[in-house]
């Protein structure tokens, strides 16, 4: 799935209008990769599923402007079940909160148009978790070193949670 996402992005960056893309085939493939809990597998061969593939699926549907082939309600439920007591999101329900998976979760919710449906308490908990990641830069989870990668993910989260800061 990530290869499809990457290729679509390259086409778009190259100025392609995606008119040559077999949208129906891509969307059918996504539908076949969605599991009954709303998550997505990377491929039929790689049975693992986590928030990265939920993000990729939402992004592919956004790029193709078509969410009809997937169960967006189940997808949203899966994302929300992955929120931890800390307010951030794990790769899957019950897993540790992580900067990258939190970005994938909130970005997917934004693409689904479901971010506005989060209550303020949920947003506040996530905002607090993000602010606790700051030392000299951001880390991706408690008791970890600051890292350029996580500084990017947490920085992007701030833009998702506070869109008025889009030019920071």
What does each model-identified segment do?
Residues 1-19, 42-70, 85, 90-125, ...:
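An alpha-helical repeat/solenoid feature that recognizes helix-turn-helix modules
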Residues 19-21, 25:
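Short, flexible active-site-proximal loops enriched in glycine and acidic residues
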Residues 26-31, 37, 79-80, 126-130:
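Buried hydrophobic core positions in alpha-solenoid tandem helical repeats
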Residues 39, 78, 88:
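Conserved beta-strand positions that form and line the central face of beta-propeller blades
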Residues 73-74:
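C-terminal beta-sandwich interaction modules and adjacent acidic
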